[in-house]
Amino acid sequence: MFRITLAIWLSSIAATACAADITVFAAASLKESLDENVKTFAAKSGRQVRVSYAASNALARQIENGAPADLFLSADEAWMDYVAQRNLLAQGTRRNLVVNTLVLVAPADSTLSLRIAPNFPLAAALKGGRLALANPDTVPIGKYAKAALTSLGVWSEVEKTLTRSENVRASLVLVARGETPLGIVYATDAKAEHKVKVLDSFAASLHPPVVYPGAVVAGRLNPATQALIDYLGGPEARAIWIKYGFGIAR
């Protein structure tokens, strides 16, 4: 009888521990910073956190299709709006966490020098190569970059050269490997990859603000998920975001 009771008790503990796990769907560009943040949160709270990284558009559609995400961290407000409009966010949990900057990058050993300005010779600088950029129709970094290049008057010249990568990290890899001469990524991505160098930054006025909102998914609000979204907007997390090059959303 004691063994049966003990087995039931241990099974209950295991089930509780499993139930306490938190699954986060997060924009690919958050990887290093969020990895450190969830590690810190887990150490303090005892909660285990799993993170799935991908393009925000892909994650939003997975949530729409019933994927078991507890939190969603998007690289733009539009895809968070997409989820919210389908009543898939827990009310009162959405908040803007961090902001980012767009940069033009080249392989670290490139001799190319190029400054961003109206009508700057981006297409000519590619010399027949391709511009590493995530899909501008769906992926946040691609949409921001399209807006910036349109503002600068060079979008029509480079549109056909795009790699249309699935996310910003895929674009970063192409540049780091020297498979493309240039790419557009977030400043935080460039900081995380020593095999690329930043040629110049895009002025924030050229595109919509690069804001990363976070929220708990509908039906997933509990003390653990509330604690995590609160932590990610709190002072300890802010210090980690800043360490990796993000700005704090106001």
Kindly give the residue locations of the regions a language model identified:
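Bacterial N-terminal signal peptides that target proteins for export
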Residues: M1-W9
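Intrinsically disordered, low-complexity segments
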Residues: W9-L10, A203
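N-terminal signal peptide c-region/cleavage motif recognized by signal peptidases
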Residues: I13-A19
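Alpha-helical transmembrane segments and their juxtamembrane interfaces
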Residues: L10-I13, M80
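Exported/periplasmic ABC-transporter solute-binding proteins
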Residues: A19-A67, S74-E77, D81-N100, V105-R250
